[in-house]
UniProtKB/Swiss-Prot annotation:
Keywords assigned: Acetylation, Isopeptide bond, Nucleus, Phosphoprotein, Repeat, Ubl conjugation, WD repeat
Primary location class: nucleus
SMART domains: WD40
The protein's name in its UniProt record: Transducin beta-like protein 3
Keyword Phosphoprotein: yes
Pfam families: Utp13 (PF08625), WD40 (PF00400)
Residues with N-acetylalanine modification: 2
WD repeat residue intervals: 64-105, 107-146, 149-190, 193-232, 245-284, 290-329, 332-372, 374-413, 419-459, 477-516, 519-560, 562-602, 604-642
Compartments reported by the entry: Nucleus, Nucleolus
Native organism: Bos taurus
Length: 800
């Protein structure tokens, strides 16, 4: 524990992204492979391939044109994937390698809306927004058929399951189903029974029966031998997909007799099983209230025994096909993330509130996702109790809910409460014990909700349903929306922050006003108590963070640095630093003592609404309007250890370099200096070589024995030396060796040689001119010396 405390108390200097939870499905088609191990789905310009077991994105396929994907299909043999983009290009992929094997024009005059393979994985049919249907041979790489006659967008194509019959079915805006013969290259029949768009076509195993579904709330059974409708089944909902079930008993689905049964998915948000002969619904899932629950897609993987359904809010649900037991849940797109929290005693899970009534709980180890239903409108805020298993949520539906995660990681609602008259925008849990909740609302009031002891003593999942909470105290606190509430570490104080530009301090449990913090120029988004000192932090839309003293309500410090609203603030490093997030998508780390912004982190592209720190203070979690949830890891100690190791390595190498120079082992000394990537050190070695009596030969021998990458580095260093007249001689000496012994063609293949030559030429010319002038001056001095010699003095006469 002492080590943990010491680690928490150190100043942090940097965070690094540990992992991201990003959107992988934004609507459109989804498809399982035959084994049920891979899931293919569209996300804008990419087709993402998910590993069903782990939930991780294995590969993202994006066409060269980088346009939105409008349609795709996987061949029945799971070998070929074809995608169509808005640029009217078709791409054939070897998806397991992630490579494009063929790219060709769709020849449609408008984007491709749908496509489907035939059972042999040889033919591909494409339906376009131009009303045309085309058939392609993907093995021989040519177009085989072009069918016209469909009015409007062709949004559905399907091949007959018997490849010998060579029949293609399509449906367009006229609500009819057209049957095309590939042999006769003509339309055999137009099947009319629907009065609204046909949404799916599926075939029986023997190929004699076809089921069609539509938004006209009916499903039609067709006899493909006579091409006539044999039965119309009213299903009382707009159907987006229908699936024929295998003709075998499935008691858990209500299939107890032989005969044709099918499953529908539609706007009621529940899967239902129907008996075709009687038109009865023999099994139905429980319906869930709230928007976004409508089912938009459903597909069956027969070999894997899996059924996949997709909801309107982009959640993917994987069921056991024989029992409809839920196996997996995937959150494809979270839209705008409004709040995030670590969950579990060891912060092993993450709970996310997005622009949806559903909560999403992710296991950080396995990436498994749970989707929690309960609220009927958008969830706005979250908070977690001290032990980590119990957490609370509040929403626009004016209610709050309490959830508990059991030891196996399953989460269930254990309590709910209502009483506010407007959206509940903020919630905070008690800090010492799991005893109460505090909520703030757009009705300008704060409510205190005690948790009954019976709730705390019971396990997860009450047989009688969630416990109903009653508010113990209600207080009108501000004149505008309350954006944030915070409970002090001792559970005796409450802070509120509002759009009225003030924060207020209250005494619990009676909510008595103690004082007001005034000073911000715009509304407050967040208030937080320091875990160590009697200090309150406030974050405002004016782009500042302020620290306030609880004793006299004075402003102690103001932190400026965000260019936009500061949305969240949290204390880290035992209250000595702050972590803040803003609407500019940035995360900032501050040291309180000197008002310094230590680090600015950028991993989001929009407003960062959610910010939470782990129990050990070594990780942080952020969620933003760009649909991303980012997990950050404190890398301060790792970076410090890395820097220390680098310094020690530099000292050792410097000592080794000095020893090599002393021993006149120039080749190894030069190689070591180059590996250090220090031009001045390399210059020192070159100067030592040139001081040797046999400098020319030794320099030439040493340079020529270097590897090519070392010569490239040496050439770059020469550019730096050549800019200084004191070091240009060493640069020119090295350059002379290279030019004399390396062929021009070889030199031109060096990495960065052109940039090096551009840097060498002007300074070399300048040095040449300077030396030429010096040579002229020296020659002139020599000339003057020879011409200014004094004549010989006359010899003195001999003495008489």
């Amino acid at each position: 524990m002492a080590e943990v405390a010491a680690g928490v108390g150190r100043f942090k200097s940097n965070y690094a992204v540990e992992r991201k939870i990003e959107p992988f499905y934004k609507g459109g088609k989804v498809q399982l492979d035959q084994t049920g191990q891979h899931l293919f789905c569209v996300c804008g310009t990419r087709v993402n391939i998910l590993d069903v077991a782990s939930g991780a994105v294995l590969r993202s396929l994006e066409q060269e044109d980088q346009e939105d994907i409008t349609a795709f299909d996987l061949s029945p043999d799971d070998k070929v994937l074809v995608t169509a983009s808005r640029a009217l290009l078709l791409a054939q992929w070897a998806w397991q390698e992630g490579s494009v094997t063929r790219l060709w024009k769709a020849i449609h005059t408008a984007p491709v809306a749908t496509m489907a393979f035939d059972p042999t994985s040889t033919l591909l049919a494409t339906g376009g927004c131009d009303g045309a249907v085309r058939v392609w041979d993907v093995v021989r790489c040519y177009g085989t058929h072009h069918f016209r006659g469909s009015p409007g967008v062709v949004h559905l194509v399907a091949f007959h399951p018997d490849p010998a019959r060579l029949l293609l079915f399509s449906s367009a805006a006229d609500t009819s189903i057209r049957v095309w013969s590939l042999q006769e290259r003509s339309c055999l029949a137009v099947l009319t029974a629907h009065y609204s768009a046909v949404t799916s076509l599926t075939f029986s195993a023997d190929g004699h029966t076809m089921l069609s579904s539509g938004r006209d709330k009916i499903c039609v059974i067709w006899d493909l031998r006579s091409l006539q409708a044999t039965r119309t089944v009213p299903v009382f909902e707009s159907v987006e997909a229908a699936v024929l079930l295998p003709e075998e008993p499935a008691p858990e689905l209500g299939v107890k007799s032989a005969g044709l049964h099918f499953l529908t998915a539609g706007d009621q948000g529940a899967l239902r099983v129907w008996e075709a002969a009687s038109g009865r619904c023999v099994h139905a899932q429980q319906r869930l209230r709230g928007p976004g629950r409508e089912l938009t897609h459903c597909t069956l993987a027969h070999a894997a025994g899996l059924l996949l359904s997709v909801t309107a809010d982009h959640n993917l649900l994987l069921y056991d096909a024989r029992s409809l037991r839920l196996r997996k849940q995937f959150a494809g797109y979270s839209e705008e993330v409004l709040d995030v929290r670590f969950l579990g005693p060891e912060d092993s899970h993450v709970v996310v509130a997005s622009n949806s009534p559903c909560l999403k709980v992710f296991d950080l180890q396995t990436s498994a996702c749970q989707i929690l239903h309960g609220h009927t409108d958008i969830v706005l805020a979250l908070d977690v109790f001290r032990k980590g298993r119990l957490f609370a949520s509040c929403a626009k539906d004016q209610s709050i809910r309490v959830w508990r995660m059991n030891k196996s990681g399953e989460v269930a609602c254990v309590a709910q409460g209502s009483g506010h008259t407007h959206s509940v925008g903020t919630i905070c849990c008690s800090r010492l014990k799991e005893t109460f909740l505090v909520t703030g609302s757009q009705d300008c009031t704060v409510k205190l909700w005690p948790l009954p002891e019976a709730l705390l003593s019971k396990g997860t999942g009450h047989e009688g349903g969630p416990v109903f909470l009653q508010a113990q105290a209600t207080q009108h606190c501000h004149d505008k929306d309350i954006n944030s509430v915070a409970v002090a570490p001792n559970d005796k104080l409450l802070a509120t922050g509002s759009q009225d530009r003030t924060a207020k301090l209250w005494a619990l449990p009676r909510c008595q006003l103690l004082g007001t913090f005034s000073g911000h120029r715009r509304g407050l988004w967040c208030v937080q108590f320091s875990p160590m000192d009697q200090v309150l932090a406030t974050a405002s839309a004016d782009g500042t963070i302020k620290l306030w003293a609880l004793q006299d309500f004075s402003c102690l410090k103001t932190f400026e640095g965000h260019d936009a609203s500061v949305l969240k603030v949290a204390f880290v490093s035992r209250g000595t630093q702050l972590l803040s997030s803003g609407s500019d998508g940035l995360l900032k780390l501050w040291t309180i003592k000197n008002n310094e912004c230590v680090r600015t982190l950028d991993a989001h592209e929009d407003k960062v609404w959610g910010l939470h720190c782990s129990r050990l203070d070594d990780r942080a979690l952020t969620g933003a309007s760009d649909s991303r949830v980012v997990l950050w890891k404190d890398v301060t100690e790792a970076e410090q250890a890395e820097e220390q190791a680098k310094r020690e390595e530099q000292v050792v190498k410097q000592q080794e370099l000095d020893n090599l120079l002393h021993e006149k082992r120039y080749l190894r000394a030069l190689g070591l200096a180059i590996s250090l990537d220090r031009p001045h050190t390399v210059l020192t070695v070159i100067q030592a070589i040139r001081r040797d009596p046999e400098s020319c030969e030794k320099l030439e021998t040493t340079v020529l024995q270097l590897r090519r990458d070392q010569k490239e580095a040496l050439l770059r260093f020469c550019v730096t030396w050549n800019t200084n007249s004191r070091h240009c001689h060493e640069a020119q000496a090295v350059l002379g060796v290279l030019l004399r012994h390396e062929a021009p063609d070889e030199l031109l293949t060096y990495d960065g040689v052109r940039a090096s030559l551009e840097g060498l030429l002007p300074y070399t010319e300048r040095h040449f001119q300077r030396l030429s002038r010096m040579l002229q001056a020296a020659t002139f001095l020599d000339f003057l010396w020879h011409n200014m010699k004094l004549p010989a003095l006359p010899t003195a006469p001999a003495a008489l």
